């Protein structure tokens, strides 16, 4: 019997793997697991832990003893969000999960929104990527200042301007992937970023490779416990990556124009 045959199907008919990177998330993770399974009881969860000093990884190990839906990858040191997702999603593809969902461990993503992404993935257009978006009609953010909202909107506008993507929330962290598309195009092997720029890079990689991308509205909550992993280097990484992409796009357009 294969791994896929042993999996319990989700309400949408196929097993889904939820990948959650962690680093010192003991304050939030236990509650998140409970809430996730309350809304998507048939989903499997993979924790990718970077040797959290607060014992997050050890807690997951103990929880796994009586929970077959829970899995863990232990990494030797803090190595960045992008590599955590690449490792976790790669594991999911190898294990035969047809759908892989990215989710934060800090409580920012509401488990109640997960069925919406799963239902949209089952739509007749068979999307390859479903993004939980703050910036489409019906999307919302709780706990952010007006300045932070404006910066996020401006950042996403800059991404759309530079990269020519129609996606309204390219920096969103809650997203559902079709594994077959990732595997067919070897998307994970093309990732160059190490941090939070991963979200923008994955959006552009999948779009440029012909993915069918759609967005569904979600409510994003500001972290209420633990420490934020965001710092200025993350924004610099995203800015440099997007600007390079925009310049490359303009260069290609100019070459096409002059070659006519």
Predicted regions and their residues:
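Acidic helix N-cap motif at the loop->helix transition within catalytic regions
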Residues: 27-31, 54-63
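Short beta-strand/loop segment that forms part of the nucleotide-sugar
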Residues: 33, 42-52, 73-74
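Cell-envelope/extracellular polymer assembly enzymes that use nucleotide-activated donors
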Residues: 15-17, 44, 201
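Hydrophobic helical membrane-anchoring modules
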Residues: 1-13, 188-260
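A conserved acidic beta->alpha catalytic loop
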Residues: 49-58, 77, 107
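Acceptor/aglycone-binding surface of glycosyltransferases and processive sugar-polymer synthases
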Residues: 73-94, 99, 111-196, 223-233
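N-proximal low-complexity "stem/linker" segments adjacent to membrane-targeting elements
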Residues: 1-35
């Amino acid at each position: 019997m294969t791994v896929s045959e042993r999996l319990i199907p989700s309400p949408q008919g196929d097993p889904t793997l939820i990948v959650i990177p962690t680093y010192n998330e003991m304050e939030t993770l236990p509650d998140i697991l409970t809430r996730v399974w309350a809304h998507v009881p048939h989903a499997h969860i993979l924790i990718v832990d970077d040797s959290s000093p607060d014992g997050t990884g050890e807690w997951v190990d103990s929880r796994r003893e009586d929970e077959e839906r829970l899995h863990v990858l232990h990494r030797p040191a803090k190595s960045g969000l992008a590599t955590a997702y690449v490792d976790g999603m790669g594991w999911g593809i190898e294990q035969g999960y047809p759908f892989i969902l990215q989710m934060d461990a800090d409580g920012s993503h509401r488990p109640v929104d997960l069925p919406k992404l799963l239902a949209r993935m089952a739509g007749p257009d068979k999307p390859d990527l479903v993004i939980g978006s703050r910036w489409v009609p019906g999307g919302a953010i709780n706990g952010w200042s007006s300045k932070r909202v404006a910066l996020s909107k401006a950042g996403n506008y800059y991404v759309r301007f530079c990269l020519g993507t129609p996606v309204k929330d390219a920096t969103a962290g809650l997203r559902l992937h079709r594994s077959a598309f990732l595997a067919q195009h070897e998307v994970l092997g093309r990732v160059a970023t190490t941090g939070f720029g991963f979200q923008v890079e994955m959006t552009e990689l999948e779009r440029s490779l012909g993915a069918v991308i759609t967005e569904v509205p979600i409510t994003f909550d500001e972290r209420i416990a633990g420490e934020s992993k965001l710092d200025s280097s993350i924004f610099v990484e995203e800015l440099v990556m997007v600007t390079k992409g925009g310049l490359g796009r303009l260069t290609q357009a100019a070459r096409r124009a002059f070659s006519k």
